[in-house]
Amino acid sequence: METVFEEMDEESTGGVSSSKEEIVLGQRLHLSFPFSIIFSTVLYCGEVAFGLYMFEIYRKANDTFWMSFTISFIIVGAILDQIILMFFNKDLRRNKAALLFWHILLLGPIVRCLHTIRNYHKWLKNLKQEKEETQVSITKRNTMLEREIAFSIRDNFMQQKAFKYMSVIQAFLGSVPQLILQMYISLTIREWPLNRALLMTFSLLSVTYGAIRCNILAIQISNDDTTIKLPPIEFFCVVMWRFLEVISRVVTLAFFIASLKLKSLPVLLIIYFVSLLAPWLEFWKSGAHLPGNKENNSNMVGTVLMLFLITLLYAAINFSCWSAVKLQLSDDKIIDGRQRWGHRILHYSFQFLENVIMILVFRFFGGKTLLNCCDSLIAVQLIISYLLATGFMLLFYQYLYPWQSGKVLPGRTENQPEAPYYYVNIEKTEKNKNKQLRNYCHSCNRVGYFSIRKSMTCS
């Protein structure tokens, strides 16, 4: 989990704004330009914009069925994105009416992206101004400058983490059903207009990006939250693996649904509920107990609800591709950080069998009606694409995995980018010496970006 920070106000710091402050810096944190946040925002905007445009086209054509599902997947994905961003930034605990207003309008990712870019340029400006300051004496101006730098760093890393989780949830709870639906519509009416193709392209990019994020998260967990840096060859291998896996699985599902129509629904529900119930069956078999106070029923209900939501997302990921992690509800960490070849091989074996069965159903029941020709060739290409994806997966874990090839950056963690500590020492006057300085780095993580200590003058 990430460390979440709160800004310091006068009440929490005991009126420290009117006191003499001294800031002692540790190692300087380095921030990079938020390209990942911009990319996630572009995917969000593109998918929502083209989805709304297709909704308008279906509405004018009186296609109520397709119109309803298209707008439903857009709204569900967009609302979940707003909830994730507000959850990580703890907006509901603060008086942030303006940000809440933008989230209600489903424009939260755009506003936060622009805010992060502004903070990054503000951080660069403050660093440049800090270097120009004389080091003869530390004034209150220097104190406020260092605090602005600290807040910029805190906000940048918090937004990066929030957008990472937003990308995963948007991909597998919004983009996957949207991509399957639009492909099903194209197969049914045998038309591929440019607008629908662009919507499918953004959805495919979103799912692939979310799958890559799952891989990076799994590698960080297996290496104790250590930051990784994949060279171009390793990154290309992961991209090809995830792209081929996602495209072959999604096209297979679309062909299967188009072949059997509503008769395919029970099969798809069985596949989904197997992934959903498997962690709970393993938890029940282990005989473990849920964490928390058994006497507090509300706490127990909240824990069960949170675990159920996690398993819903876990099953949605495994429905379209491999989640790269294994849920272990009996453990306090929930996610098993060990690399299990057995779990990996079992997943790909069963999913390959599912794909072959669905492709055979398409070949013998829907190939002639959905496609005028080349149904056998397409079926073979789908199987070969999935086998190629499995081959890239084996290549990555056997020869290019960062833990084995020494590409883990020592001394750096996801929660601790480059500097181990960032100390803020505050000397307060005798008027405020009985008021305690609140640590604005919450302990929701093992290691914080900041460590605050207080020095008080003795009368």
From Swiss-Prot:
Primary residence: membrane
Keywords of this entry: Cell membrane, Membrane, Transmembrane, Transmembrane helix
Entry's transmembrane regions: 35-55, 68-88, 97-117, 169-189, 199-219, 238-258, 264-284, 300-320, 345-365, 377-397
Name of the featured protein: XK-related protein 3
Example of a GO cellular component annotation carried by this entry: plasma membrane
Location within or outside the cell: Cell membrane
Signal peptide positions on this chain: none
Family according to the record: Belongs to the XK family.
Tissues with expression: Expressed predominantly, if not exclusively, in testis.
Membrane topology annotation: Multi-pass membrane protein
Pfam families recorded: XK-related (PF09815)
